[in-house]
Amino acid sequence: MEGALTARDKVGVQDFVLLDAYTSESAFVDNLRKRFSENLIYTYIGTLLVSVNPYQELGIYTVSQMELYQGVNFFELPPHVYAIADNAYRMMCAELNNHFILISGESGAGKTEASKKILEYFAVTCPMTQSLQIARDRLLFSNPVLEAFGNARTLRNDNSSRFGKYMDIQFDFQGIPVGGHIISYLIEKSRVVYQNEGERNFHIFYQLLAGGEEERLSYLGLERDPQLYKYLSQGHCAKESSISDKNDWKTVSNAFSVIDFTEADLENLFGIIASVLHLGNIGFEEDDQGCATIPDTHEIKWIAKLLGVHPSVLLEALTHRKIEAKTEEVICPLTLELSVYARDAMAKAVYGRTFTWLVNKINSSLVNKVGQRILDPLLLLTWKTVIGLLDIYGFEVFDKNGFEQFCINYCNEKLQQLLIERTLKAEQAEYEMEGIEWEPIKYFNNKIICDLVEERHKGIISILDEECIRPGPATDLSFLEKLEEKVGKHAHFETRKLAGPKGRKRIGWMEFRLLHYAGEVTYCTKGFLEKNNDLLYRHLKEVLCKSKNIILRECFLLAELENRRRPPTVGTQFKNSLSSLLETLISKEPSYIRCIKPNDRKEPSKFDDFLIRHQIKYLGLMEHLRVRRAGFAYRRKYEHFLQRYKSLCPDTWPHWHGPPAEGVERLIKYIGYKPEEYKLGKTKIFIRFPRTLFATEDAFEFSKHQLVARIQATYKRCLGRREYVKKRQAAIKLEAHWRGALARKAIQRRKWAVRIIRKFIKGFISRNKPLCPDNEEFIVFVRKNYILNLRYHLPKTVLDKSWLRPPGILENASDLLRKMCVRNLVQKYCRGITAERKAMMQQKVVTSEIFRGRKDGYTESLNQPFVNSRIDEGDINPKVLQLISHEKIQYGVPVIKYDRKGFKARQRQLILTQKAAYVVELAKIKQKIEYSALKGVSTSNLSDGILVIHVSPEDSKQKGDAVLQCGHVFEAVTKLVMLVKKENIVNVVQGSLQFFISPGKEGTIVFDTGLEEQVYKNKNGQLTVVSVRRKS
């Protein structure tokens, strides 16, 4: 327990309502400091979120954090901006009403970042469909574009919003984001042409120069150095280390592609941006008559090209003014000062209206284009709810405050008034009206300041408008004098003339001071009339209306030139816009985020007590805390409360027929509310603690599941019974029909079977008779059956002689089919033979013609395939190859040569070429026998391998016949015969053969059979060859 208390004391309390000294401002600040020092930047005041800008990344905005807060009761987890977003979303879905989240605070307090985090939370956690993915992405990516064109670096904030933005996120009845709409307020156009020291122009200018492609910049006539442009260099901080313009350009470029900007849109848009920079670089000189001239028209040409106007027309419009006098037009030259004013007015008008066009373009891409969803055949449910996000400029106090700060601070006064009306004042008034005991809490009501600014005919804006339109020379000084005359007695207004001796030293002669709810602000009236009028000379309007730039043509319509009525002033437009905004916000349920800036230097971990106390005071946080401590967190009319939670009590469910107040009393008694947790008013129930409401809501969620389960069970039982009865009746009827159909089908089948059997018997009896009606079907059946059976018994090879025996009537057809089948098998076999195999078979045919039935061993040789050669070319001596290189070797085989004298066996190679046969001994050719000199080839009828090549005895070149023994005698003889191309040269002898040894001398080879093969010289000097007898 002590450890828990120590931890709590270290990091403070996460809800200021739990502070013991809740009336002490010091305790309030001390709690903020403790949490800030531990990087706990969020703290609650009831359901209001206080956020302190950490000026650093804390890593608390991950997807896992979003999922952690999704669907969780508000106070179950530590304070977070995601909790505010989730609570607004769940309340919207549960009650089907509209909500808004008001984010307020000084400039630099983190309002824009809070707005982005809420938008990211909705994008990630809301249910999403593929078709609505585009709408979600466009909502997200609209932010970088608007920040680029509407935000700038100021002395207090590197990303200060210089316009007000209200975004409505539209959800359908399922809670899916389907679209959105953005309203912008009072873009600070004067920043386009002038920036204070240490400040920058709008981000887009620097991003374009830093990250734009070389081709784009060349087309726009721009250089990368921002110091070259007057409109970008006045604050002397064009390049800031804390801002990465190049990376931001990539983000903006990607966003443009997501939110449906075409290349033509971007070309026109950046043409306008570049033309503003070129405008700022136009230099004027004064001629002898005191009129303005432009000596260097280089920038004029670029502007004319980018805006699609004629250079001479633009030049004239910047140095002359067109004045209409009844039916005549007079063009008067401008002085140097007025030409500079015209140039700056044109730059501001072009940028301001382009920004408005940009917002409208984004809105057109955010329009909900999803079709209606049909939940019921008789109901089209198109209900849509919205959550609004208000990210508007914070209260600003600079060393020099002008018209823009006046409008911004007036806006903050109105928002403070809204908060007072919706919280402090309205809540206390409600307690009094409902008869709830209450101790009134004092607070400052800033309505008196709002009236000072906006009251009709009497307020500062009305006085400013009068001064702008009155005839005669109206000046900023005359406006200040008019203020002193009409509102000089107001307690919150002061000028140097009206102030006391001490106050005069701090107010200049052209200044006035307003005592705002946030403190005193001194405004310089210089430029008030000019900025309120926002005058653009008619001559310049005509030029812009005729521009070929599509965006400018939409921004400057020709109808403006025809309208002679004076347009409303900037102040009046802003006042009307604020009134419209407040009407929108009042119609929605609010959530509040109060942003606090911890220091003026944008330094992390630095906590400025004085600055924070000032913000706590003017944000009214102490008053809000006191109201929350003393008040009630939730109130609802009896009818609504009973209607929502009646299912929690058996007495009120499903219908309560008595007065709603009694029903609510019965309901809370059953639930178990303690007396200190609630009060019953005249028309409403008030619940003091959020935890009481959340417990009730949890019970309601559980009850809903039970009710749904019960309703589902009853409905399913009813549907099931109805379906069962329906199916049972259908099954009985189907069964009856099916049985009848089966019976009819069985009878028909039996009749059919009788007819078939009768025909079969008749056909069988008369099967041998000529074709007639009695046997026609039988014979067709027999034919068909035979053909069908035959296909499963066809021979697979040519050698397969089997054939299915046919019936007598099909013998002729069977013979024809058999011949066709054999022919088909032969063709199939022949098509499958390769060229190499075909050549081998041809050789086998020659072998058959020579040896079949004439020599033993022929039958065994049939299964031995012939080869191209039995000797590889590498086995032949290179010298031999060189000797016969002029001839191609066709065949080679190892042989044994027997000497003609003595019959000694010697290993040799027999090589056959195209022209001759060679008997080779290693590197020497022993005998060459040309085919032309070949007389014959002899071999025995036995299985020996003796081969005798006969030559002519008269041939002096030959030594005699060659007696060889070869292991592949069939192959060798066949190859030799095919090369000689004479089959009749082979002589298969029986018993013995004579061969030529030398001129006039012959030898004899005797062939015999025995138990084993042998070759030897017998006693008679003959060569005896013994073979084992085989079947031929």
From Swiss-Prot:
Pfam families with a match to the protein in the record: Myosin_head, Myosin_TH1
UniProt disease annotation: Central hypoventilation syndrome, congenital, 2, and autonomic dysfunction: An autosomal recessive form of congenital central hypoventilation syndrome, a rare disorder characterized by abnormal control of respiration in the absence of neuromuscular, lung or cardiac disease, or an identifiable brainstem lesion. CCHS2 is characterized by shallow breathing and apneic spells apparent in the neonatal period. Some patients have other features of autonomic dysfunction, including bladder dysfunction, sinus bradycardia, and temperature dysregulation.
PROSITE patterns: IQ (PS50096), MYOSIN_MOTOR (PS51456), TH1 (PS51757)
Entry-annotated residues carrying Phosphoserine: S365
One GO cellular component term: myosin complex
Annotated ATP binding sites: G105, E106, S107, G108, A109, G110, K111, T112
Entry function: Myosins are actin-based motor molecules with ATPase activity. Unconventional myosins serve in intracellular movements. Their highly divergent tails are presumed to bind to membranous compartments, which would be moved relative to actin filaments.
Family: Belongs to the TRAFAC class myosin-kinesin ATPase superfamily. Myosin family.
Domain IQ: 704-726, 727-756
Organism field: Homo sapiens (Human)
Molecular function terms from GO: actin filament binding; ATP binding; microfilament motor activity
GO terms classed as biological process: actin filament organization; actin filament-based movement; endocytosis
Domain Myosin motor: 12-701
Residue ranges, annotated region (Actin-binding): 578-600
Alphabetized Gene3D superfamilies for the sequence: 1.10.10.820, 1.20.5.190, 1.20.58.530, 6.20.240.20, Kinesin motor domain (3.40.850.10), Myosin VI head, motor domain, U50 subdomain (1.20.120.720)
Record gene name: MYO1H
Residue span, TH1 domain: 855-1029
Keywords: Actin-binding, ATP-binding, Motor protein, Myosin, Nucleotide-binding, Phosphoprotein, Repeat
InterPro entries noted in UniProt: Kinesin_motor_dom_sf, Myosin_head_motor_dom-like, Myosin_TH1, MYSc_Myo1, P-loop_NTPase
Protein name: Unconventional myosin-Ih
